[in-house]
Amino acid sequence: MNKNCISASWRCDERTARQVCSADDSDKMADCCKRPEDFQCPINKTAKLDFKELRYATKVPQTPVDTVFPETTANRVEIDAKTIQLLERLSLVNLDSEQALATLNSSIQFADKIAHINTENVRPLYTVLENQQLQLRNDEVKEGDCRVELLRNAKVTDEDYYVSPPGNIPLEQ
């Protein structure tokens, strides 16, 4: 390890290693940093993750893939004032400004584009870890009818429902 010191998955340049190791020349620095427990890589601008060497084969493309989203101008959704008032009341977000309405419209258009993407012949994703098998268990009921025991765990219940504290103070209309 003469020019680069490697600690876990971090690769540091020689200058950073010198600062940490307090060594004056490369030979001393290399001796200092041979043991990972002696070398702690600081998190700074010179430390970078090394993504060039992958441990496992991956299905994720290594270069960006251009995806053409279908144009949905024909299906453009118009939001009336009543719907905006309902959204304000449910989300507790004030949508009075033009910028807020523009953001809402662009979000709806983006969601509409995603909804129209062709996903035929795409296998469902069960786990984000490609190199590990996810063991799915059979959906069998082992302990049934434990509703009363589960409701005892809640501080406040109403009939057969949990009562949660309000997250925000509602807007005054």
From Swiss-Prot:
Belongs to the GatC family. This is Glutamyl-tRNA(Gln) amidotransferase subunit C, mitochondrial. HAMAP family: GatC (MF_00122). GO terms for biological process: glutaminyl-tRNAGln biosynthesis via transamidation; mitochondrial translation; regulation of translational fidelity. It catalyses: L-glutamyl-tRNA(Gln) + L-glutamine + ATP + H2O = L-glutaminyl-tRNA(Gln) + L-glutamate + ADP + phosphate + H(+). Allows the formation of correctly charged Gln-tRNA(Gln) through the transamidation of misacylated Glu-tRNA(Gln) in the mitochondria. The reaction takes place in the presence of glutamine and ATP through an activated gamma-phospho-Glu-tRNA(Gln). Keywords: ATP-binding, Ligase, Mitochondrion, Nucleotide-binding, Protein biosynthesis. The lineage of its organism: Eukaryota, Metazoa, Ecdysozoa, Arthropoda, Hexapoda. InterPro entries: Asp/Glu-ADT_sf_sub_c, GatC. The keyword Transmembrane does not apply. Its EC number is 6.3.5.-. This protein may be expected to contain an N-terminal transit peptide but none has been predicted. One of its GO terms (cellular component) is mitochondrion. It is found in: Mitochondrion. One of its GO terms (molecular function) is ATP binding. Subunit of the heterotrimeric GatCAB amidotransferase (AdT) complex, composed of A, B and C subunits.
